[in-house]
């Protein structure tokens, strides 16, 4: 394996953030970058990662998925729950559901209200969302037209259930929005997806890394499992990794950029001697710097599926039958169209379940077939389902390494559903969803409630169902939170620099101080775009002046 020993920057993790940094930093021809990825290439001929409709497949094996498990979750019947994370060029953008959702404007204004994060307002972040994006129907004040990330919008003629579901949400009294990433997130409407015009997954490997790979100043090493960051005193000076179980080293002249994501980044820091001193001493890890927030503040989104039989034969159930799949695959492969070219999450919404919330606290994804996210337990009959979950749970978890061995998975505990608010939100979510499915727009379609089943009505029954059946939405975050140095639990400052150390930044979803209202791929890419300008010493993009919606205490729904 040929790698030089010295680079300006070493990036750990070729995922949603790392590939953005690698691409932007190597635009400066005099800068050398080493990009380390524990997984393999993103094989372009592997339909499992490239076909949007095949999104369940990468979660089923371990080629593309770290397949972490939580410790027994105490409020979830002590279940050890899935915590899938992407492995390979593209990271989790190689295996995610491809929903292009940025979060609510108020999420970022909320971040910016925290000491030290003043330049993370929505209007500061919006130019970087736009910079990353090329939207298929063209740019506007909210969307970009020249970015590496391809975004596809739902089109007329898609499955009729999508429009019916949006209409039902409006009939139930909730707002309609024509763009969940535009002026107003709150309401029901079409959902954009990170898919190319030719119907392929638009991961950061395809969008960004394809631009950077030909550059002589970028070196990419796959199957490189990071062991630890190397320090000289309080300065990060390099990285040690394993390649075929053999230790390799490189040094960084300027900075080490940690982009491992919300599970891997705290692990790597802790193994490197940065984290809670008591934990590190108990594992005989030499302490470089005591930072109690490393691995703390862990957050995620939890979600439920509500599944219904479909009275009309218009769902995607036939696509699950093996004898129909060759034709679907051929149309996608040769034409880039058809069922295979969509992730099938083409409608959804964000609502407030109660006026106690200043911005939406529930997210909906609608799917015109009933099946688990990982492809298990498909319903054979015509059916559809709604995914619903709370967005800003007060529950907080933690990540602890178990040993110095980089091959050993960490101890992960989210403490899902550990607050009363969690239970109130999930009870409301299930009851509101049933109301939506009872509206006239869905009356021609909505049949028997398959799951949870109409017999479950009381709080106790709903709570028991949630404990047994709620699953992760695969949005782990916030485990190395941004904040002012005066906050003892903050790990990095507003520019991603690790407190108390030099030459080390974290750039990924772990630095979010609070999880955003929506999916995490688009915000993670934005964070990397924004911090790439900081690292390069460039003037930040001018703040946007686009207007955006605030509920300001408005009723959560219109009464009929």
Curated annotation (Swiss-Prot):
Residues bound to FAD: 8-37
Top-rank taxon, per record: Bacteria
Alphabetized InterPro entries for the sequence: BetA, FAD/NAD-bd_sf, GMC_OxRdtase, GMC_OxRdtase_N, GMC_OxRtase_C
Entry GO CC: membrane
Keywords: FAD, Flavoprotein, NAD, Oxidoreductase
Cofactor: FAD
Active site: 475
EC numbers on record: 1.1.99.1, 1.2.1.8
Any GO BP annotation: glycine betaine biosynthetic process from choline
Gene Ontology MF term list: betaine-aldehyde dehydrogenase (NAD+) activity; choline dehydrogenase activity; flavin adenine dinucleotide binding
Keyword Flavoprotein (UniProt): yes
Pathway where this protein functions: Amine and polyamine biosynthesis; betaine biosynthesis via choline pathway; betaine aldehyde from choline (cytochrome c reductase route): step 1/1
UniProt xrefs under PROSITE patterns: GMC_OXRED_1 (PS00623), GMC_OXRED_2 (PS00624)
Reaction equations catalysed: choline + A = betaine aldehyde + AH2; betaine aldehyde + NAD(+) + H2O = glycine betaine + NADH + 2 H(+)
One Pfam family here: GMC_oxred_C
Enzyme class of the recorded protein, top EC level: oxidoreductase
Protein family: Belongs to the GMC oxidoreductase family.
Biological function: Involved in the biosynthesis of the osmoprotectant glycine betaine. Catalyzes the oxidation of choline to betaine aldehyde and betaine aldehyde to glycine betaine at the same rate.
HAMAP family: Choline_dehydrogen
NCBIfam families on file: betA (TIGR01810), PRK02106.1 (NF002550)
The protein's name: Oxygen-dependent choline dehydrogenase
Record gene name: betA
């Amino acid at each position: 394996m040929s790698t030089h020993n010295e680079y300006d920057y070493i990036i750990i993790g070729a995922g949603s953030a790392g590939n953005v940094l690698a691409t932007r930093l190597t635009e400066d021809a005099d800068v050398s970058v080493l990009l380390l990825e524990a997984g393999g290439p993103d094989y372009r001929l592997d339909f499992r990662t490239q076909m949007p409709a095949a999104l369940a497949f990468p979660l089923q094996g371990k080629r593309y998925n770290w397949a972490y498990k939580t410790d027994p979750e105490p409020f979830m019947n002590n279940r050890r729950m899935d915590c899938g994370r992407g492995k390979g060029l593209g990271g989790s953008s190689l295996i995610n559901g491809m929903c292009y959702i940025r979060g609510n404007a108020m999420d970022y204004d909320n971040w910016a209200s925290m000491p030290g994060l003043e330049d993370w307002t929505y209007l500061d972040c919006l130019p970087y969302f736009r910079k990353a994006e090329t939207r298929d129907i063209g740019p506007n004040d909210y969307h970009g037209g020249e970015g590496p990330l391809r975004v596809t919008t739902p089109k007329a003629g898609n499955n009729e259930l999508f429009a019916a579901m949006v209409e039902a949400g409006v009939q139930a009294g909730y707002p309609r929005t024509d763009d969940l990433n535009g002026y107003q997130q709150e309401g029901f409407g079409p959902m954009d997806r990170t898919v190319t015009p030719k119907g392929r997954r638009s991961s950061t490997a395809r969008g960004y890394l394809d631009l950077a790979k030909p550059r002589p100043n970028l070196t990419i090493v796959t199957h490189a499992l990071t062991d630890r960051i190397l320090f000289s005193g309080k300065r990060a000076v390099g990285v040690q990794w394993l390649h075929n179980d053999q230790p390799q080293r490189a040094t960084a002249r300027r900075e080490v950029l940690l982009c491992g994501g919300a599970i891997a980044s705290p692990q790597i820091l802790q193994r490197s001697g940065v984290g809670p001193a008591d934990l590190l001493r108990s594992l005989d890890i030499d302490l470089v710097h005591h930072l109690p927030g490393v691995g703390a503040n862990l957050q995620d989104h939890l979600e439920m599926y509500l599944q219904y039989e479909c009275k009309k034969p218009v769902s995607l159930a036939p696509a699950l039958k093996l004898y129909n799949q060759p034709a679907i695959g051929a149309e996608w492969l040769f034409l880039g169209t058809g069922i295979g070219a969509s992730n099938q999450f083409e409608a959804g919404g964000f609502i407030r379940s109660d006026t106690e919330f200043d911005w939406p606290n529930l997210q909906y994804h609608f799917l015109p077939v009933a099946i688990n996210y990982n492809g298990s337990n498909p319903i054979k009959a015509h059916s559809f389902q709604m995914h619903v979950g709370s967005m800003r749970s007060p529950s907080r978890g933690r990540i602890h390494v178990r040993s110095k061995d980089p091959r050993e998975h960490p101890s992960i505990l989210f403490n899902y559903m550990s607050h009363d608010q969690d239970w109130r939100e999930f009870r409301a979510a299930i009851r509101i969803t049933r109301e939506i499915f009872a509206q006239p727009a869905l009356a021609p379609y909505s049949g028997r409630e398959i799951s949870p089943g109409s017999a479950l009505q009381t709080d106790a029954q709903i709570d028991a169902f949630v404990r047994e059946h709620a699953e992760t939405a695969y949005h782990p975050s916030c485990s190395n939170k941004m904040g002012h140095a005066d906050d003892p639990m903050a790990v990095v400052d507003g520019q991603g620099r690790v407190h108390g150390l030099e030459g080390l930044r974290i750039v990924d979803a772990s630095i979010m101080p609070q999880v955003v209202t929506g999916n995490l791929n688009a915000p993670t890419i934005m964070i990397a775009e924004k911090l790439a300008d900081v690292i390069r010493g460039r003037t930040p993009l001018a703040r946007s002046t686009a207007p955006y919606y605030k509920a300001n205490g408005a009723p959560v729904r219109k009464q009929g």
